[in-house]
From Swiss-Prot:
Originating species: Iotyrris olangoensis (Sea snail)
Annotated coiled-coil segments of the chain: none
Domains as described in the record: The cysteine framework is C-C-C-C-C-C-C-C-C-C-C-C-C-C-C-C.
Cellular component aspect of the GO annotation: extracellular region
Protein name according to UniProt: Turripeptide OL55
Source organism superkingdom: Eukaryota
Protein task: Acts as a neurotoxin by inhibiting an ion channel.
Main location: secreted
Record key words, sorted: Disulfide bond, Ion channel impairing toxin, Neurotoxin, Secreted, Toxin
Tissue expression: Expressed by the venom duct.
An example Gene Ontology molecular-function term: toxin activity
Processing and modification events after translation: Contains 8 disulfide bonds.
């Protein structure tokens, strides 16, 4: 569902990237990371429904800190893997995961 603010969304969802999505640690189950707010991944555990609990968002007061040196905080405030790094999570904005590495 499209949105411009969280009040446009059904209860329990959050407006992220103009879409109503499941917030971090939200009650709703997810199928893929695209069901979760930007920077949060969907995790499956022992065949249970997916949960939005893998947090790749930048940390700190200014939301500009990434603890993994292979990642950097991009303009979406997501800790994305840098060019040439193995994509164990999202690549930084502008890169895609190809052949297990983040590339332009």
């Amino acid at each position: 569902q499209a949105c411009s603010e969280t009040s446009d969304c059904l209860e329990g969802l959050e407006c992220s990237g103009n879409q109503c999505l499941i917030p971090y640690d939200g009650d709703d189950s997810c199928v893929t990371g695209f069901d979760c707010v930007i920077g949060v991944g969907c995790v499956y555990d022992n065949g249970n429904p997916g949960r939005c609990i893998r947090d790749h968002r930048c940390k700190g007061d200014k939301k500009d800190i990434c603890t993994n040196p292979a990642t950097e905080c991009d303009e979406d405030k997501v800790c994305g893997y840098k060019e040439g790094e193995t994509c164990y999570g999202p690549c930084r904005k502008g890169l895609t995961c190809r052949n297990t590495r983040c590339q332009k």
